[in-house]
Every structure is written in C-alpha cells, then in structure tokens.
Amino acid sequence: MAKEKRVKGEWKRLTVQAAAFLLQNPKLHNFFLGTIDTGKTKVLCAPGLNCYSCPAAAGACPIGSLQSALTPRKPSFPFYVLGFLLLFGVLFGRWICSHVCPFGLVQDLVYKIPFPKKVRTFKGDRILRLLKYAVLLVLVIALPLFDTLKPYFYKYLCPSGTLFGAIPLTLTNPMLRGQIGFLFWWKVGVLVTLLLLSLLIARPFCRYLCPLGAIYGLFNRFALLGLTCDASTCEIGRASCRERV
C-alpha cells in the first residue's frame, strides 16, 4: 500500500512538472525553426532555471536576469529580479525546484532508469551541498560585477542552457554549427557528466551546483508551501527521501 501511494505521488509530481515545462516553454515549434522567441513576455522571469535561449521559452531565467543587472556595462540594482525571487521564495521555497524546474524534471526522468546501485548519500555529501552557495556568490554575483562580457555561470556551467538552448539551436541553425568550438564541447561534457551522475544520485545538479536552488533554499524553512519532518514521531519519510532532506 505504501509503495502504491509513493508511485502514485511520483506520477502526480511528474504531471505537474510536465505542465510547468509547457507553461514556461509554450512555443515548441521554435525548436524546429532554430530561433529564439523575442516576444514581450521575455522581459518576465520564469520561476525555474528555464534558459532564455531555449527556442520555446516564453520568459527569462532569473539567474540570467540577475547576472545581466549586475554587469558594470549597464549597472542597475536588480529590484525586479530580487523582488521576484523574494516573492516566489516566500510563497514556495524549494517546491519550485521539485515541481517547476525543467532541468529538475530531466534529472528525475534519468534517475528513474534502472541502475544496479542508487546512491542515497555518501561521506562528504553535506559538505558538497555548500558548493551551490559558492556558485551563487562567485559565478553569479561576484565575477559579473567585475567583467562586463562574461556571464560565467551560463558560459561555463549551466546544463539547462546547454540542453534546452545551445544543443537545439546548434542542431537547427547551420550558422551556429560552423561556430562550434571548445566551449560548446566543454558545456556538453558538463551536461553529460551530470546526466550520468543522475543515474546514481537524485538531482546532482540541484543538490550541489544550482544557484537558483541555493536562493530558494534560504526561504525553505518559512515558505508558505513546504515540507516539514518531525523526526521524533516518524522516520519513514526521512528514510525514503531521495534528497535526504
């Protein structure tokens, strides 16, 4: 009975995740055209790590918007982006990560592939989780403040941008294929590594590297929509949680 409830709950979550993906990326035909939508809604942020360069995207990524606002070339205090993150953080916390983020959905689907050994936790797991705060402070905030031309997180690390933006655009746009170089293959390597790790570990990018998850995590304890665990009365949820919350 417990297993049936768990499976049913997982399918419900996958349904919400799929719906969230379509809401954030409604212009699917652009995948075949090799173009980026530039409609009026692109000035608005999506709640998840949804790449602006994704051909189907109807909005902007909040991390990308934050980086753009911090560049010295056109410095401005990111009132809108910070207000957006504050609002969604207070309302939902990391529920956004588990139910709305497109790359979170991809990792969940990969984790469902049968594999001989799934890793729930390991020595050093808690320390590695601090990496995402370093990514936020260094790659997203500090470095863009001193370099006008390099959005470091997206240029060197972001797997969501590679999967939903760079790869589809390169496949459908001959001009871009002619410009493929080391940086493209570096980001493909990062993406492949994270997807392979997703066979073993639930959401490795979310756990260890995602700066948006780091921001939402700051609100998790007092978000209106969140998860609580009373260890004094029940250990079932803690034992079965893939994320080891």
Language-model segment annotations:
Residues 1-244:
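Non-ligating segments of multi-cofactor redox enzymes
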